[in-house]
From Swiss-Prot:
Residues of the signal peptide: none
Entry keyword Membrane: yes
Phenotype on disruption: Alters assembly of FloT membrane rafts; more diffuse rafts are seen. Double floA-nfeD2 deletion mutants are wild-type. No visible effect on FloT membrane assemblies.
Role: Plays a role in assembly of FloT membrane rafts, probably recruited to rafts by FloT.
Locations listed in the record: Cell membrane; Membrane raft
Inducing stimuli: Expression is sigma W-dependent. Up-regulated by alkali shock and by infection with phage SPP1.
Name of this chain's protein: Membrane protein NfeD2
Keyword entries, A-Z: Cell membrane, Membrane, Transmembrane, Transmembrane helix
Organism listed in the record: Bacillus subtilis (strain 168)
């Protein structure tokens, strides 16, 4: 079968090369175009490019291997591509989009947070405090702000941070 005077097998190959190249470019420069698909989530460029890549690859291989009509091969390739794109969307893109970005924090962000002593803080000495949050758990060295001993398991309030060491005081809920 021919399409626009070109054999369908050649069209599949050209589409595969173009879609594969665009997919590779989108992989490297996708952040530049990230806002284009905000309003229409089902037209995610990753899914569209993946569909055309899978469709053209399936059609090309089908034309080489299967002794079926070109329309049936195109239909089978389209169905296979839709299934692969749906699986890609459900099992890769949705979990990646809902994943936490990082555990990056500034030390100033810890000021005013509550933590729990995991190594007792002696008078004029160092202990350790763990601060739990949505992004994860942070463990930091700590000294007593009031120069008093703070025992294990005490809930503390971070008052200040000096050179990566937290100054804490026991927290008393109101």
């Amino acid at each position: 079968m021919e399409l626009f005077g070109v054999p369908i097998q050649t069209m599949y190959l050209y589409t595969l090369i173009i879609a594969g190249s665009l997919t590779l470019l989108f992989l490297f420069f996708g952040d530049v175009f990230s806002g284009l698909s905000e309003g229409i989530p089902f037209l995610n460029p990753t899914l569209v490019l993946s569909f055309f890549t899978c469709f053209s690859a399936g059609g090309y291989i089908g034309e080489l291997v299967l002794p079926l009509s070109s329309l049936l091969i195109a239909l089978l390739s389209c169905i296979l591509s839709i299934m692969l794109v749906v699986l890609l969307h459900i099992f890769v893109l949705v979990p990646l989009s809902s994943a936490e970005e990082s555990l990056a924090y500034r030390e100033d962000d810890l000021r005013g947070r509550l933590g729990k002593v995991i190594t007792a803080v002696p008078v004029d000495g160092f202990g350790e405090v763990v601060i739990e949050g949505i992004g994860g758990t942070i463990s930091k060295s700590a000294v007593s702000f009031d120069n008093q001993q703070i025992s294990y398991g005490t809930t503390v309030l971070v008052v200040d941070i000096n050179n990566g060491v937290l100054s804490v005081t026991p927290h008393e809920p109101i």
